[in-house]
């Protein structure tokens, strides 16, 4: 019979692999344990001992109201990104929304579950990450339709106009990536983190092409590196955007760039 020490990490792991809250796991600690859950627990503990991030080890990650499947096919959702969703939900309603570089699908699914959009299109260039996003669509089963399209950045969005385009693109340089902790570099997908010599290749491309895809007064919302607010604002102005706001994340760092399409951008 499996003996769990019920230290904080033990409880967290058991709760995650068994689909319970930590409180529920504690209350049911003396109940017989299903062999398949025991196997998941032991596998997760072995992975944690090797330095695998907690979310990957247990195969689950929370994001806003969602409990999602997660593995090394996509980045682990970050709490900072939840704030990006907040800003979009406050400013955009109805119509089509798009999520660029969806990864696990956390942004797209949050927009579908919490927002009032008619439909959400999620774009992902990695076939493996796109498959994970589809798994999470099946898991969450949002009432608002979510469609995953494979392709790079804005290309799969052609042929429609969007009320909101949201993106958490890669935004690090190679040097910044090299300075990350081993728990990130050894396990999370590099291509979801690094974006050219200045870290802005993906952001630059989205700023250059998004206006043509937005409805009048449509919203572009980007997560950005905290060190690049001024650079992103300059890129936006160079791309013809006339309204750009930079907002702080929950840690007080400039993290979100919001641009609204005006008549000038529609010319």
Predicted regions and their residues:
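Helix N-cap/coil-helix junction residues
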Residues: 6, 20, 142-143, 241
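Conserved AdoMet
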Residues: 12-87, 91
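General small-molecule cofactor/ligand-binding pocket signal
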Residues: 69, 147-149, 245-247
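Mobile active-site "lid"/loop adjacent to the S-adenosyl-L-methionine
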Residues: 171-202
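Flexible, glycine-/basic-rich loop-and-beta segments that form/coincide
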Residues: 262-267
């Amino acid at each position: 019979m499996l003996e769990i020490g019920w230290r904080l990490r033990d409880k967290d792991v058991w709760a995650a692999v068994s689909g319970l809250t930590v409180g529920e796991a504690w209350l049911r600690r003396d109940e017989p344990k299903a062999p398949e859950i025991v196997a998941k627990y032991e596998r997760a503990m072995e992975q944690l001992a090797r330095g695998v991030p907690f979310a990957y080890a247990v195969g689950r990650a929370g994001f806003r109201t969602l409990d999602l499947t997660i593995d090394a096919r996509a980045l682990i959702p970050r709490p900072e990104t939840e704030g990006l969703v907040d800003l979009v939900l406050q400013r955009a309603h109805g119509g089509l929304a798009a999520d660029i570089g969806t990864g696990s699908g956390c942004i797209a699914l949050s927009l579908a579950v919490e927002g009032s959009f008619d439909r959400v299109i999620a774009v992902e260039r990695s076939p493996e990450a796109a498959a994970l996003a589809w798994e999470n669509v099946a898991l969450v089963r949002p009432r608002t339709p979510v469609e995953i399209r494979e392709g790079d950045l804005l290309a799969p969005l052609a042929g429609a106009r969007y009320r909101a385009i949201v993106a958490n693109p890669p935004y690090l340089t190679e040097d910044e990536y090299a300075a990350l902790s081993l728990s990130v570099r050894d396990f999370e997908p590099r291509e979801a983190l690094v974006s050219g010599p200045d870290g802005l290749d993906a952001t630059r491309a989205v700023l250059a092409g998004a206006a043509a895809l937005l409805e009048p007064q449509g919203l572009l919302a980007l997560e950005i590196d905290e060190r690049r607010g001024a650079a992103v604002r300059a890129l936006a102005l160079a791309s013809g955007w006339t309204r750009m706001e930079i907002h702080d994340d929950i840690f007080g760092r400039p993290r979100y760039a919001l641009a609204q399409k005006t008549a000038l951008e529609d010319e």
